[in-house]
């Protein structure tokens, strides 16, 4: 069984037992969180597609950890002007483990 849910402006395809990195959520490590913005739920033979959300669809997950992603380097450069600017950014994330999916 798998589901597609929305969190942090992004859509994630998950199955029970998978670990997913989401945009940072203000939830303590070890707590359980429920996602109710489920767009699709499918088991072996049936597929429930929401319009836009699946009625009664829910994805339950446990927060594993919080952290920061690898650094992304941004370089701005102006040709022939001896000007360049180098910046970096590390995005915060929350890692969750999917425990249950229901339609």
Swiss-Prot record:
Summary of the function given for this chain in its UniProt record: This protein binds to 23S rRNA in the presence of protein L20.
Q: Which gene encodes it?
A: rplU
Family affiliation: Belongs to the bacterial ribosomal protein bL21 family.
Q: How does it assemble?
A: Part of the 50S ribosomal subunit. Contacts protein L20.
Keyword Zinc in annotation:
no
Name the SUPFAM superfamilies on file. L21p-like
Q: Which PROSITE patterns match?
A: RIBOSOMAL_L21
Q: What is this protein called?
A: Large ribosomal subunit protein bL21
Q: HAMAP family this protein is in?
A: Ribosomal_bL21
A cellular component term, taken from the record's GO annotations: ribosome
């Amino acid at each position: 069984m798998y589901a597609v849910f929305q969190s942090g402006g992004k859509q994630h395809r998950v199955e029970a037992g998978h670990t997913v990195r989401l945009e940072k959520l203000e939830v303590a490590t070890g707590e359980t969180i429920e996602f109710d913005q489920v767009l699709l739920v499918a088991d072996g033979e049936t597929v429930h597609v929401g319009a836009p959300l699946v009625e009664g669809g829910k994805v339950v997950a446990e927060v594993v950890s919080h952290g920061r992603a690898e650094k992304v380097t941004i370089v701005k450069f102006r040709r022939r002007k001896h000007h360049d600017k180098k910046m970096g950014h590390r995005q915060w994330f929350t890692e969750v483990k999917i425990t249950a999916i229901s339609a």
